Amino acid sequence: GQTPPRSAYYPGAAQRQEDIVQSHGGALVVDDRPANEVPRTMVAGLDSRDAAESLFRHECFVSVLSTTTVPGDGPGEYLRNAVRFCNENLWGTLGAVILVHPKTIKELGAAFEDAIAELRYGTVGINVWSGIGFLLAQLPWGAYPGHTLDDVQSGMGWVHNTKLFDRPQKSVLYGPFYAYPRSMTKGAMTMLPKPPWFVLNKQGGNVQRRFTDFEFDRNPARIPGPLPLSARLGA
């Protein structure tokens, strides 16, 4: 089913969405404008060579998705160009995601690890939402180091980091390319059910409440509570 529009709680969200629609003739407004909400909007086909493109340089803080393309003859060249584009053209350094087939990772070999190392982002997710890094208290969460008060972008410093890493640069998260049970048919031994943070997981609220209870007192007896709910794949 279709999820309803989310509340745009950032001040000025409605005006920013309207400005984007007015300045981009190809903008697609996905929803009818609901009362007191901001409709989801998509702007496709931006020119990656346009250094003045506002959507590359400003954070919307509203449900606007934009897409662009970069050249590349083969995965290796494409990945290098994509990393360069992100580092040099996009404003903000908090999180980035690479969606990549496991076979491509294997084919690229060390070049894939080099690409991760070159990305100037505080959290890099490989086939997983980078925001999971915020949910894991062990990982440092913050912008890539190097911002100043004159150009603060995504901020300075870190939160969480319960393992007390000294001067961390970035966190890298890996997730399964195939969701369970399809992963089993592809030879990937991952048993991850539909993640509880997915909007279509009907058990998400129950799972997260029970995991919160476990985090509160670390009583192993609480573990059987959320696991059966998770195994139901959000049904």
Question: How would you label these PLM feature ranges?
Answer:
Residues 1, 19-26, 117, 121, ...:
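Generic surface-pattern signal
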